[in-house]
Amino acid sequence: MLVNTIRQKVSEVISKVYDSEIEFEIEIPPKKEFGDLSTNAAMKLAKTLKKNPREIAQEIVKSLDEDPSFDRIEIMGPGFINFFLSNELLRGVVKTVLERKDEYGRENTGNGVKIQFEYGSANPTGPFTVGHGRQIIIGDVLSEVFKELGYDVTREMYINDAGKQIKLLAQSLWARYNQLLGVEKEIPEGGYRGEYLVDIARDLVSEIGDKYKDLWNEEVEELFKQTALNRILSSMKDTLEKIGSSFDVYFSEKSLIEDGTVEEVLKLLKDRDVVYEKDGAVWLKVSAFIDEEDKVLVRSDGTYTYFMTDIAYHYKKYKRGFRKVYDIWGSDHHGHIPRMKAAMKALDIPDDFFNVILHQFVTLKRDDEIVRMSTRAGEFVTLDELLDEVGRDAVRYFFAMVDPNTHMVFDIDLAKAKSMDNPVYYVQYAHARIYNLFSNAEKKGVKFEEGKHLELLGNEEERVLMRNLGMFNTVLKEVAQMFAPNRLTNYLQSLAESFHAFYTKHVIVDPENPELSNARLNLALATGIVLRKGLKLIGVSAPERM
């Protein structure tokens, strides 16, 4: 809100005086003596016009000098313009928040453009790991923020239910089934050793007895494959419910083969002369588009590679009418991006259609010791176990608060702490404090009138809090532009910090001064609205009591 206001005013001056349009930054300066907000507009324009940036800054300041939105405007250094906002402008933020309530921060930047976020996608060969958990929360927050900015968002999970890993899963379950019946069977090389398969095998023994003891054929393979898939997918959906996540679409890889999409795409690629046969396999001419080796699409035994089905999947996304798709992948899949871009180009799909957001790995820390994890070895902490230990709110907030590009160390002890050192507790406590103020006001006989006496707000702590409230929609845009949910958690920490400072330094509910109390309660209410909205976008509760 505040950034939009200043951007519009500065842009109008630049257009009127210099007949130019430029992109420039507006941000909170590092020190309070530099004002409430600062811009580099003069320096950006100076590069374009080949003029002295301070002279341009002086012209901008001169044009805005009488504007009631500013107490004063100063030029610093080579041409930074520092704005000291008027109380009138800041009070307008509180008024707007109170008027719009949960709609505050919502914009129509996206104009209903149809986009898709695909995330959480995993081989259904075992429970979700904590790494999957991080990806799910990144996807959830980005989906919510893009919806808030006016995009038509579809959340989708891709189920890798075709391919060699599913056969390995069936063989692993069959081995566990036989072991329970007293038959010595080894888990196949590269198979799955987790205890979850023992539980499924135990249920199978109860249901069918020893019917398939030491018996393996296509029928048995299909039975064990479907049993494992159904049980694990059901368990994964239970975990999603526990973490508070849901998807609009669960898309089966197998369906792409069954409905002919893979063959359709393969024919398209052949018609475009971007595939060839070698050693009995079908290859994509990746090297015709990027500096990388060609890749196999169909193996010599006639089975499709994961690359082939993935190309078909994204072709189908395009045909479903998405303007852009965003896949969220672990950083170990970065090598798959260029070849997928090449495949999209081969299908004549626009360059900006397919986008990938990478995230780094997660390490768990408990009692200052690192907990190590591995899916196939069966020795890993599941997302369910983490949720059971620290709770949904902490899991969601902690996964959101680290830049996706940064390796994350999840401190279990900190996540469980009921103290102000715990970031999620710190923000939630600010929200609970606000609601306690209204209970306190009622007990003390202070009548609350929404939107009244805002003209009494204006001390330093109130100004900082009002300014921070006015940055909310700017932060949402930053989250979307940078694909960085941590921008939102950083903002909520800052907003909570400014509220705690306001709460600690000033008497908010004072029966001897009802009008000032009312003004401060309005500021507190506006803060509560934004805290609650921000937490909701992350999928975290906003308790009224703690």
Curated annotation (Swiss-Prot):
Name the predominant localization: cytoplasm
Which GO molecular function terms does the record list? arginine-tRNA ligase activity; ATP binding
Which Gene3D superfamilies does the annotation name? Arginyl tRNA synthetase N-terminal domain, HUPs, Isoleucyl-tRNA Synthetase, Domain 1
| Annotated disulfide bonds | none
Q: Which reaction does it catalyse?
A: tRNA(Arg) + L-arginine + ATP = L-arginyl-tRNA(Arg) + AMP + diphosphate
**Cell membrane as a keyword?**
no
Identify which top EC class this enzyme belongs to.
Answer: ligase
The entry's localization annotation reads: Cytoplasm
The UniProt entry, under Pfam families, shows: Arg_tRNA_synt_N, DALR_1, tRNA-synt_1d
- Give a yes or no for keyword Ribonucleoprotein in this entry: no
Instruction: Give the keywords, sorted.
Output: Aminoacyl-tRNA synthetase, ATP-binding, Cytoplasm, Ligase, Nucleotide-binding, Protein biosynthesis
Mind telling me which SUPFAM superfamilies this protein's record contains?
Anticodon-binding domain of a subclass of class I aminoacyl-tRNA synthetases, Arginyl-tRNA synthetase (ArgRS), N-terminal 'additional' domain, Nucleotidylyl transferase
**A biological process from GO:** arginyl-tRNA aminoacylation
**Family, as annotated:** Belongs to the class-I aminoacyl-tRNA synthetase family.
Quaternary assembly? Monomer.
Q: What is this protein called?
A: Arginine--tRNA ligase
Which organism does this record belong to?
Thermotoga petrophila (strain ATCC BAA-488 / DSM 13995 / JCM 10881 / RKU-1)
Q: Gene name on record?
A: argS
